[in-house]
Curated annotation (Swiss-Prot):
One record GO biological process: muscle organ development
Main location group: nucleus
Subcellular location: Nucleus inner membrane; Nucleus outer membrane
Swiss-Prot/TrEMBL keywords: Acetylation, Actin-binding, Cardiomyopathy, Disease variant, Emery-Dreifuss muscular dystrophy, Membrane, Microtubule, Nucleus, Phosphoprotein, Transmembrane, Transmembrane helix
CC annotations in GO: cytoplasm; cytosol; endoplasmic reticulum; membrane; microtubule; nuclear envelope; nuclear inner membrane; nuclear membrane
Domain of life, per lineage: Eukaryota
Tissues of expression: Skeletal muscle, heart, colon, testis, ovary and pancreas.
Entry PTM: Found in four different phosphorylated forms, three of which appear to be associated with the cell cycle.
Lineage: Eukaryota, Metazoa, Chordata, Craniata, Vertebrata
Quaternary data: Interacts with lamins A and C, BANF1, GMCL, BCLAF1 and YTHDC1/YT521. Interacts with TMEM43; the interaction retains emerin in the nuclear inner membrane. Interacts with SUN1 and SUN2. Interacts with ACTB, SPTAN1, F-actin, CTNNB1 and beta-tubulin. Interacts with TMEM201. Interacts with NEMP1.
Protein name: Emerin
Matching SUPFAM superfamilies: LEM domain
Species in which this protein is naturally found: Homo sapiens (Human)
Disulfide bridge map: none
Entry annotated with the keyword Transmembrane helix: yes
Length: 254
C-alpha cells in the first residue's frame, strides 16, 4: 500500500484505466480507496496467475514512466479485468476471458485438441509477446481460409450450359452430332454453341393449329358467299318491283 503513495494522480489514474477499474476523479478523499482497489487487484492477480509467470504478470512501477504513453495503445481484455474486479470474494471459480476462449481456474482442463488453444493472457511475459501470438494466430487462420478457397471447384459459363443441355437436350443437335445423352466436360463448350444455333431451327410454333388470318374465312361462315350474293340480288329485285308499282299507282289514280 505504501508503494502507491509515491504515485501522482495521473499515474494512479493510468493504473485504474489499465486494470479497467471504475473510477472517478482522483482527489484526496478518494485516493485511499483507489489505492486499496489496485492493491487488492494485483494481490488477487498474483495469486491466480501460474507460478511460472507470477513475476511477469505483476505490474512493475519502475517502468511506469516508459509505458505511460503506450497505456492507451493496447489494453488487456476488458472482460477479463471487469470479471476479476467484479467477482465477489475472489474465489477460485473465477472466469478469465482472453481473445480466443474462456478458462476456469480451479477446474481441470479437458483433454483434446482444444488444450493448445486455451491459453491464459498472463502466461505471456509481456504484452508484446501476447500481441505477437495473436498476430501469428490470425496469419494461420487466414492461410487456412485461402487453402479452403483454392480447394473449392470453380464453375464457369460452360457449367451453366451443361446443366441446361442436360435437362433439356435438343433432339436435332444430338442426332446430327451423334453425342450421348449426358454430355462430358470436354464436349460441353462445343455442344453449347451447336445447340444454341440448331435449337432455333428445330423450334416449332407454340400453337400449330392456329392458321393465318383469312385462310378459312369462307368455311367458318354458315352461308356461302354465292348464296349471300344471290339473296342480295333477290332483295334488290323485290325492292325494284315495289318501287315500280308505287310509281304506277301514283300516275293512274283511277
Amino acid at each position: 500500500m505504501d508503494n502507491y503513495a509515491d504515485l501522482s494522480d495521473t499515474e494512479l489514474t493510468t493504473l485504474l484505466r489499465r486494470y479497467n477499474i471504475p473510477h472517478g476523479p482522483v482527489v484526496g478523499s478518494t485516493r485511499r480507496l483507489y489505492e486499496k482497489k489496485i492493491f487488492e487487484y494485483e494481490t488477487q492477480r498474483r495469486r491466480l496467475s501460474p507460478p511460472s509467470s507470477s513475476a511477469a504478470s505483476s505490474y512493475s512501477f519502475s517502468d511506469l514512466n516508459s509505458t505511460r504513453g503506450d497505456a492507451d495503445m493496447y489494453d488487456l481484455p476488458k472482460k477479463e479485468d471487469a470479471l476479476l474486479y467484479q467477482s465477489k470474494g475472489y474465489n477460485d471459480d473465477y472466469y478469465e476471458e482472453s481473445y480466443f476462449t474462456t478458462r476456469t481456474y480451479g477446474e481441470p482442463e479437458s483433454a483434446g485438441p482444444s488444450r493448445a488453444v486455451r491459453q491464459s493472457v498472463t502466461s505471456f511475459p509481456d504484452a508484446d509477446a501476447f500481441h505477437h501470438q495473436v498476430h501469428d494466430d490470425d496469419l494461420l487462420s487466414s492461410s487456412e481460409e485461402e487453402c479452403k478457397d483454392r480447394e473449392r471447384p470453380m464453375y464457369g459459363r460452360d457449367s451453366a450450359y451443361q446443366s441446361i443441355t442436360h435437362y433439356r437436350p435438343v433432339s436435332a443437335s444430338r442426332s446430327s452430332l451423334d453425342l450421348s445423352y449426358y454430355p462430358t466436360s470436354s464436349s460441353t463448350s462445343f455442344m453449347s454453341s451447336s445447340s444454341s444455333s440448331s435449337s432455333w431451327l428445330t423450334r416449332r410454333a407454340i400453337r400449330p393449329e392456329n392458321r393465318a388470318p383469312g385462310a378459312g374465312l369462307g368455311q367458318d361462315r354458315q352461308v356461302p358467299l354465292w348464296g349471300q350474293l344471290l339473296l342480295f340480288l333477290v332483295f334488290v329485285i323485290v325492292l325494284f318491283f315495289i318501287y315500280h308499282f308505287m310509281q304506277a299507282e301514283e300516275g293512274n289514280p283511277f
